[in-house]
Amino acid sequence: MAFDYKKEYKEFYMPKGTPSIVTVPKMNYIAVRGSGNPNDADGEYKQAIGLLYGIAFTIKMSKKEDHQIDGYFDYVVPPLEGFWWQEGVSGIDYARKEDFKWISVIRLPDFVSREDFDWAIRKATEKKNQDFSKVEFFSYDEGLCVQCMHIGAYDDEPATVYAMHRFMEEQGYTLDITDQRMHHEIYLSDVRKVAPEKLKTVIRHPIKRA
């Protein structure tokens, strides 16, 4: 059985539909930075997703290549995630999607070193004849957060965010969104195959003691 991060780390990928407090450890990611409306058909975001999965599957299938990754075990590629912000806005203004700045990411297994990552960039570039220069090795220590499973359309997220913030305050915490700590989403559903009202998205916000 391939190792599935969603199932092995349910506290990070499968929270309940009610808010909870969690401390997220440092993780490494495949990452692409960009800006603009994620719904644009030919926008940066759609291109970024293609780049991310190109590297993610190159690493996953490295077991069939000459480059052998030390400590490799078979695994399910983790879900797509995104860190989002807007200049001059505290939190997210869903009515201004064209102003989004984002870092789109896919988690890397801990056994993937920076050298393995660099190999994957070279391999994918050669095999797919495509430019992967925007893809980076990204380490992030998220720390203390409030999170909740949001079920429904992305535009309906504000209601879940409101419940998260109310719970956070009741527990003695305050929001800690900064230039380094951002609105975070983990996408558990394939938007191409799942109806908007059934989409599952983990929403996570950084917090600190009030």
Show the residue positions of the predicted features.
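A solvent-exposed interaction/effector surface
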Residues: 1-210
